[in-house]
């Protein structure tokens, strides 16, 4: 079983607090799949406004957590770490469905599988679950570019 702790994750993802949304990798297999977790606590910044009377993790951040997990798998598969001259763009999402809320105290378990990698576009099947219950699912697409080649309109 191949695992990564938070210090190892930070070597592969440029994200930092408050947007680093992967706490641990439980297992990964190069070119195939990865399983990771996000421990959701009441101290998350977003709970101050989403929603004070009923805290729920925003869907867009659940998708971002899956996208970060997918990016980790891609970097691990390529055997490289990001550098100051590269950027990974999240370029597409299909079939996103939210099945249950993610709340303080939950552990979001993220499972991502590579569907294909063609012409620099990575496509993944991604799911997130809490206590064995499906919370969200989506197909994600990402690409990596060098800073000099990255068009401002290519992504966020």
Curated annotation (Swiss-Prot):
It holds the Pfam family FabA. Its EC number is 4.2.1.59. CDD domains: FabZ. It comes from the Bacteria. GO terms for cellular component: cytoplasm; membrane. It catalyses: a (3R)-hydroxyacyl-[ACP] = a (2E)-enoyl-[ACP] + H2O. It is found in: Cytoplasm. InterPro entries: FabA_FabZ (IPR013114), FabZ (IPR010084), HotDog_dom_sf (IPR029069). The active site is at residue 50. Signal peptide: none annotated. Keywords: Cytoplasm, Lipid A biosynthesis, Lipid biosynthesis, Lipid metabolism, Lyase. It is an enzyme of class 4 (lyase). The keyword Cytoplasm applies. GO terms for molecular function: (3R)-hydroxyacyl-[acyl-carrier-protein] dehydratase activity. One of its GO terms (biological process) is lipid A biosynthetic process. The keyword Transmembrane helix does not apply. Involved in unsaturated fatty acids biosynthesis. Catalyzes the dehydration of short chain beta-hydroxyacyl-ACPs and long chain saturated and unsaturated beta-hydroxyacyl-ACPs. Belongs to the thioester dehydratase family. FabZ subfamily. This is 3-hydroxyacyl-[acyl-carrier-protein] dehydratase FabZ. The gene is fabZ.
């Amino acid at each position: 079983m191949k695992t990564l702790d938070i210090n190892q994750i930070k070597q592969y993802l440029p994200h930092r607090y408050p947007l680093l949304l992967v706490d641990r990798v439980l297992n990964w297999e190069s070119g195939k799949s990865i399983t990771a977790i996000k421990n959701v606590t009441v101290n998350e910044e977003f709970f101050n406004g989403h929603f004070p009377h009923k805290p729920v993790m925003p869907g867009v951040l659940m998708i971002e957590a899956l996208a970060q997990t997918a990016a980790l798998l891609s970097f691990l598969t390529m055997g490289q770490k990001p550098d100051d001259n590269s950027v990974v763009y999240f370029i597409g999402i299909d079939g996103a469905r939210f099945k249950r809320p993610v709340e303080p105290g939950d552990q979001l378990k993220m499972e991502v599988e590579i569907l294909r990698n063609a012409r620099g576009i990575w496509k993944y099947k991604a799911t997130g679950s809490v206590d064995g219950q499906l919370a969200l699912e989506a197909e994600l697409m990402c690409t990596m570019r060098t800073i000099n080649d990255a068009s401002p309109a290519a992504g966020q």
